[in-house]
Curated annotation (Swiss-Prot):
Pfam families: Ribosomal_S7 (PF00177). Keywords: Ribonucleoprotein, Ribosomal protein, RNA-binding, rRNA-binding. CDD domains: uS7_Eukaryote. One of its GO terms (biological process) is translation. Signal peptide: none annotated. The gene is rps7. One of its GO terms (cellular component) is small ribosomal subunit. Part of the 30S ribosomal subunit. It comes from Caldivirga maquilingensis (strain ATCC 700844 / DSM 13496 / JCM 10307 / IC-167). One of the primary rRNA binding proteins, it binds directly to 16S rRNA where it nucleates assembly of the head domain of the 30S subunit. Is located at the subunit interface close to the decoding center. This is Small ribosomal subunit protein uS7. GO terms for molecular function: rRNA binding; structural constituent of ribosome. PANTHER family: RIBOSOMAL PROTEIN S7 (PTHR11205). Belongs to the universal ribosomal protein uS7 family.
Amino acid sequence: MNPTVAQQLSKTTRVEELAPGIEIIEECPRDIKALDGSPILLFGKWNVNDVVIRDPGLRRYMCLKPMLLPHTEGKYQNRKFGKAMIPIIERMMNQLMKPGRNAGKKQKAYKILKTAFDIIYVATGKNPVQVFVDAVVNVAPREEITRVIYGGIAYPVSVDVGPTRRLDLAIRWIAEGARACSFNNPRPIEECLANEIIAAANNDPASYALRRRDEMERVAATAR
């Protein structure tokens, strides 16, 4: 690594070298421990230190900071690229507080996600944080369209999706899929959310989020 770049990084920054000259910088600390040296478990149950993010393009922007309760109190709200420092679990909870009738009900979103993670563990036997990360990686789109105007006429043009927007869309679609499943349905939203995450992690076509990703990439492919 360039010595000048190394001096600018914080002490908690993790750098992974995929190949000579190809490095991935993960600025969100993952080696935080309790005062007695034991790992900090999410919801008091799940260890995030062993979670693997398979997509190198998302690794720098997907924060897996060990926290008992993922709640940053909006401290990164007005910072440039502050979303990258918000734990991905908290961002999922924030999406569950939509639409407006659920605004501010973070404890409700916390209980929904906590119960959904318990269901995922019972159904798969795996760390639900790893299953959720795999689901986000699978759902994140790589290509979309934008409008370019030439001579007063708008043309759709295919463009690559930035990593921050990829995460935004993936989390939003997973939350939308859970809400759509539980609407006018006796199944609770916790079960619907768990099933949506499991289906997305397994690349199951039954996943609402995967269908949205495929639709976006299909439209983008026709606009190349």
